[in-house]
Regions:
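General beta-strand structural signal in soluble alpha/beta enzymes
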Residues: 19-24, 43-45, 86, 109-112, ...
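Rossmann-like adenosine-cofactor binding region
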Residues: 115-205
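Predominant activation on well-ordered alpha-helical scaffold segments within soluble catalytic domains
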Residues: 3-14, 32-36, 61-69, 97-101, ...
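Glycine-rich beta-alpha junction loops
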Residues: 27-28, 112-117, 211-214, 265-267
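Adenosine-phosphate binding glycine-rich loop
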Residues: 72, 180-289
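Glycine/serine-rich phosphate-binding loop and adjoining beta1-alpha1 elements at the start
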Residues: 1-79
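Glycine-rich phosphate/diphosphate-binding loop of Rossmann-like nucleotide-binding domains
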Residues: 55-156
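Short, intrinsically disordered C-terminal tails of secreted or membrane-associated proteins
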Residues: 293-297
Length: 298
């Protein structure tokens, strides 16, 4: 039934030539393969058909880790032995935990749809990933305290990663966050009011479209024929640069999302200006192909 529905969706958007589909909550590499089969436009494809499986390799989690590496000094801690809590131990959260563990961080709490698992001395990230990959829940793990899903908000940690659903942190519960850094792994996981409260408390919140862009960057690289190695390189370079740009603005007095939006608007305006210049720089029939190519790349 799911395959039938996804193929029907693909057929419905067949004429939207600029709409390139990628995976998100509820879909995976196999689903993208069905869409590719129907309309020829999809990213995050299975390896078997030449794609880069975004969720399997943890592209978004890698990007989150890059953002955290840049932000750690600003937030006032060292990543090595930093305590991490992850809300939503799925395609994004589990890989973020894996990459952070490789950097010496310690996972002290994680949650999924069944509840929260916590251990102040540290949880075995590899064991939890194996558990989830086998179709079981965090509460099936033999160690750690089993708590309700909401208990993840109270985790004592340096890094609190929302990697589940939108609007999970809001005015009614933001006071429960006890972290120094919140890199947003999910899309819009924090309301604007809650972000402002965090900022006033000195908690650095890295906006979603900065911190969780690893999947989108990887998808764009895949679409243009890049290898996984090149995609990973691009994720690291771009997210580190974007995070640093936001932090530079924050030091100037801006709230993180305000800073990120200022940067995004500036780049969009520059891109639009460059595009207009390319279209109008020479309207004669003798415009060289090299000039057109240069404009296309800018």
């Amino acid at each position: 039934r799911k395959e039938e529905m996804i193929r029907a969706f693909a057929a419905a958007i067949a004429d939207l030539g600029e709409y390139i589909v990628g995976p998100d909550m509820g879909t995976d590499e196999t689903c993208m393969g069905w869409i590719k089969d129907e309309i020829g436009r999809a990213v995050g494809l299975p390896r078997a058909i030449g794609g880069i499986p975004l969720d399997e390799i943890g592209a978004t989690g890698l990007g989150l880790t890059a953002a955290i590496e840049v932000a750690q000094e600003h937030a006032g801690f060292s990543l090595k032995k930093a305590r991490v809590a992850v809300q939503g131990f799925g395609a994004v959260g589990k890989h973020a935990a894996r990459f952070l563990a490789q950097e010496g961080a310690v996972l002290v709490a994680a949650s999924d749809s069944t509840g929260t698992l916590a251990d102040a001395s540290g949880l075995d990230v590899a064991a939890l990933i194996a558990l989830k990959d086998s179709g079981r829940s965090l509460h099936d793990h033999s160690s750690g305290k089993k708590l309700g899903s909401d208990a993840i908000l109270d985790a004592k940690c340096d890094i609190w990663i929302p990697a589940a659903r939108p609007d999970v942190v809001h005015a009614g519960n933001v006071h429960r966050i006890k972290a120094r850094l919140m890199p947003q792994g999910a899309n819009i996981p924090c309301t604007l009011a809650a972000e402002q409260t965090l900022h006033e408390r000195g908690v650095l919140s890295i906006p979603d479209f900065i911190a969780n862009a690893g999947g989108v960057i990887c998808a764009a690289m895949e679409y243009h024929g890049a290898t996984q190695a090149l995609a990973f390189q691009a994720i690291g370079e771009r997210i580190r640069a974007n995070t640093q740009a936001v932090l530079d603005e924050v030091r100037g007095g801006f709230q993180p999302r305000e800073a990120a939006m200022r940067i995004a608007r500036g780049r969009s305006m520059n891109a639009a200006s460059s595009s207009t210049s390319c279209r109008h720089s020479d309207s004669s029939p003798t415009t060289s192909s090299s000039t057109v190519a240069t404009c296309d790349r800018s």
